[in-house]
Regions:
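GST superfamily/GST-like fold recognition
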Residues: 92, 149-164
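Hydrophobic alpha-helical bundle segments that form small-molecule/ligand-binding pockets
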Residues: 137-150
């Protein structure tokens, strides 16, 4: 198993699904705050970082994988949380992508809004997300008597939906 280091911030957001996957499989990794990894405040280093955003997965101290979806898919292959069948993989990936689309409305509400602004945003959010949750429920219902979206064992999409 390669040495894995996940670099992000102190918040539940784009690095959460990869962390859940790593914990579920008992895969060793380290978690480093962006300012510690880069040795300076994020605002000072952001423009020099590929895509100007995090998370970042560092593999064996040399290979850097950016973008949360790429990190999740890489880890899913590494720790066997993706199906071998190409058609099932497409379904799993579609569900994962749908779960990631929840991030845009959720993140500002959950991680940054407070007081009256939070209450207002929460009401709008519940109305906006209800149809998405119905979609997830429909997929779960198509696999009766299984604990995960596509059977008895989880795939990376399950962690994406669970987190969001």
């Amino acid at each position: 198993m390669p040495d894995l280091k996940l670099v992000y911030f102190k918040m539940r957001a784009l690095a959460e699904a990869p962390q859940l996957m790593l914990h579920y499989t008992g895969t060793a990794y380290s978690y480093e705050m962006a300012w510690d990894y880069f040795g300076q405040p994020w605002s000072e280093v952001k423009s020099s970082v590929l895509y100007r955003q995090l998370p970042l997965l560092v593999v064996d101290e040399s290979t850097k994988i950016f973008q949360s979806g790429a990190i999740t898919r890489f880890l899913a292959g590494l720790i066997e949380l993706k199906p071998d069948d190409a058609l099932l993989l497409a379904e799993v990936d579609a569900l994962y992508e749908a779960s990631q689309e929840l991030f845009s409305p959720l993140n500002p509400t959950i991680n940054f809004a407070v007081g009256e602004k939070f209450l207002s945003m929460r009401s709008d959010l519940i109305e906006q997300l209800a149809p998405r949750f119905e979609d997830f429920e429909r997929i779960l219902g198509s696999q009766p008597m299984t604990p995960f979206f596509f059977g008895k064992n989880p795939f990376y999409c399950d962690f994406g939906v669970f987190h969001h």
